[in-house]
Amino acid sequence: MASLLARMGNSRRQNAAFMPFAHSMLRALGRSLGPLIANIAERNIQSFSGRAELGPGEETFENWLSQVHEVLPDWPMSEEEKIKRLMRTLRGPAREAMRLFQADNPNLNVAEFLRAMKLLFGASESSITAHGKFLSTLQAQGEKPSLYVIRLEVQLQNAIQAGVLPQSEANRTRLHQLLVGAELSRELRTKLKGLLQMHAHNEQENLPDFLELIRMIREEEDWDETFLRNKRPRRSETVMERAASPVVFQGSLPIVIGSADCNVIEIDDSQDDSDEDVILVEPEDPPLSSPGASSLRGTASTQEEMLIIESPDDFDEESPSTSSGSGQRNNGPGDLGRTRKRKYPIRCPHCGEEGHAKETCDNTSNKGQVFENLIVTLQELTHMERPKPSVPY
């Protein structure tokens, strides 16, 4: 073990002394291999002459340009040296043309060199084709206006390079084609039309350029998305959910009032509900029959549960009492004629039959009858009878 540790210590001391020498060797190797790698990359570029008929070892302009873009990242040298290497790949008319262009532009860089090559030898569209493509560029179905403007800008620049449209009219032409080919909101369309009209009357009024137009459209799109995301339906409860839960309390809790004959549950409506009070009457014992009670209750059965809906407008106005000083509701015979009560029998939500509740139901489930009863009740609740006009005294 001691001998092994001694050997490890000796190797570390030797490596520490060797590290500076290794770094210097790698740097020298990189400096020597850099030009070699560049020469190898240059040899991968075929020559280009610009002639219609290709000679031996020559490439078309598109292939030559593709090879140049592949080897440029492997050239760690100055712009001037890169242009010299590119010139060595040219032959014939192409070399002569770029030599004259370089003489007129001594500070030429690689990007300008390649741009000049594209203008001289690249395939260019005719002016009629470029103009037709620009005018026929319309917004696709489901495409956002901001993406359409970006696609339109490409065709606009092609038309400008073809000489169809002047650069000074780019903003006006872009804005006009946007109004023709895009589906915009009413507010944004009105705003852009106003800018065009102001520019037509006064050319000193500046029109938005490409970036400003993109910003305006993106702001409108963000506002529309926020509005649609925050918009919620007023009532999202479905009919089947209402069937499963006939009464949903959204406001205050119901008030239970006990009496000798029945339990009366009065439901306070919230502001979103209708202007009618819903009262559920559950009889405990059959009330004693009397002529007055029979005339008031009509043909309704005394053994069944009833749903009574009274509109607050139907209640009589409270009149102050002269004896006690507290207001109470008039219950005279004349007031009964003005009170309108709509009675709807409550049916069992399990079998759909009348006269009993779900807790005491012994019948089999009949969802079809329950759903039919629900539709009828909803139709009756929706089409309330209109109040008759009051007769002037």
Swiss-Prot record:
InterPro entries: PNMA (IPR026523), PNMA_C (IPR048270). Residues 281-300, 313-341 are annotated as: Disordered. Transmembrane segments: none annotated. Keywords: Metal-binding, Zinc, Zinc-finger. The keyword Zinc-finger applies. Disulfide bonds: none annotated. Pfam families: PNMA. GO terms for molecular function: zinc ion binding. It comes from the Eukaryota. A zinc finger (CCHC-type) spans 346-363. The keyword Zinc applies. Residues 291-300, 320-331 have a biased composition (Polar residues). Belongs to the ZCCHC12 family. PANTHER family: PARANEOPLASTIC ANTIGEN, ZINC FINGER CCHC DOMAIN-CONTAINING PROTEIN 18. This is Zinc finger CCHC domain-containing protein 18. The lineage of its organism: Eukaryota, Metazoa, Chordata, Craniata, Vertebrata.
